[in-house]
Every structure is written in C-alpha cells, then in structure tokens.
Amino acid sequence: MKVDVVISADYISDDIVKDKVVVVIDMFRATSVITTAINNGCQKIIPYLTVEETLEEAKKYDNNEVILGGERRAVKIEGFDLSNSPLEYTEEVVKNKTVLMTTTNGTRALTKCLLGKKIIIAAMINAEAVAKKLLEFNDDIVIVNAGTNGEFSMDDYICGGYIINTMLKEKSNIELTDIAKTSNMIYESNKDIINYVKEARHYSVMRSLKLDNDIEYCIKKSIIDVVPIYDGDKIIKL
C-alpha cells in the first residue's frame, strides 16, 4: 500500500489518479458539507462544475425532492436553497432529498478524479472512518487536497495528515511519498488544529465572512462515522 498526496485541484492528472483509491478533501467546507448531509439522511449528492449546469439539472426534479447547495467565493449562490455551510444541512432539511451542489474548489476536485478506482469523500469530521475504510481496501491511495483557487491549502493538508496518521497507528508498513510523510509530520506537530489552521488564508476569508461557527464545526475530529463515495455520477453512503 502506497499513499501519495496532491496539493490542489490544479495538480490532478489522469495518470496520478487512474486505478487508485482517491480521497478528496475540501475541509473548508465542501467535503464537510457532503459528509454531514449524507450522515443526516440525504439520499444522494450530485456535484457540478458550474452554477448554470446545476440550475439546468434542477429542472429535471420536482421542487420537493431536490435542494440546491453551494457557494462562489464562500458566499451562497443567488437562487440556491443552501450555502456551503455544513450547519445548514440538518436532518430535517436534507433527509431523503437529492442535493445538487457546486462549489469553488471541492466539486472541481471531484470531477477531475473520475478515473480513480474509488473516490472517497473525507474531512476532519470523518477522518478516522475514512482511514479505517482505506485500510480495508488495501490499495494504493492518492489523497487529493482541493486547495483554494488552485493553490495549496494548509487546512486540507493537515486533514490528509490526520488520515495518514490514523492509518499508521494500525499499519506501520505503509509506503509514503515525501509529501505524504510531510503531511503526517504536520499533523503530528499540530494536533491542536485551530492553532494551525488560523494561519491559513482560507481561514481568514471565512473569519471575514463571520463563518466562525462553520470553522469550529469543520475542525472537529471524527465526530461522524460515515464515509461518502462518489461513483462519477452521484455521492452516496458507502
């Protein structure tokens, strides 16, 4: 078993993800939203690249069975039902519903990983459940950090490190690339997540938009035991 890390969506290529188990992380906030929604009984989530595509696909559904969710530049999209706050995706809102979703970074990363053997959705809130599944798969793994506007994101990187760290506790002979080793070392040195992520640029953006409650939620460790999986069409509970 070998683990590699891709530092942003801009660095995803078919040869890197092909036939690998791909783990997509957009901790602030898309994969935290997806994990929360699936945990709260959402039937499926369908990710789209553009707002226009999302709105067009919504026409195929009855209004009472579909929810539009997402953001651009961390702000709710006009005409959508929900923003990209995981706190909005409560059981009473999403249970048995289909969520059509588009975000700046997360859904872009997902749609670039379609050649992966499996595509797993991970966040800080379900990291240990993801690590457990990855050990069960026993395949080569690529952890894809969605990043922020194509750039490296500290928050996604430490989340990947947490997953790697959890796996190493159960299986010490995992082969790690240098960038995967560094991700693990970053987590080992910064287990108090907030003191690390507060240095991240995206953290500052979220603070400026008064999204402190989202930050507090997204940095919680392994509070959800659900692992969402993307089959290239929809995201469901594994």
From Swiss-Prot:
Superkingdom assignment: Bacteria
Chemical reaction(s) catalysed: (2R)-O-phospho-3-sulfolactate + H2O = (2R)-3-sulfolactate + phosphate
Entry GO MF terms: 2-phosphosulfolactate phosphatase activity; magnesium ion binding; sulfopyruvate decarboxylase activity
Keywords: Hydrolase, Magnesium
SUPFAM superfamilies per UniProt: ComB-like
InterPro entries, A to Z: ComB-like, ComB-like_sf
Enzyme Commission number: 3.1.3.71
Necessary cofactors: Mg(2+)
Family statement: Belongs to the ComB family.
PANTHER family: 2-PHOSPHOSULFOLACTATE PHOSPHATASE-RELATED (PTHR37311:SF1)
Stated name of the protein: Probable 2-phosphosulfolactate phosphatase
Source lineage: Bacteria, Bacillati, Bacillota, Clostridia, Eubacteriales
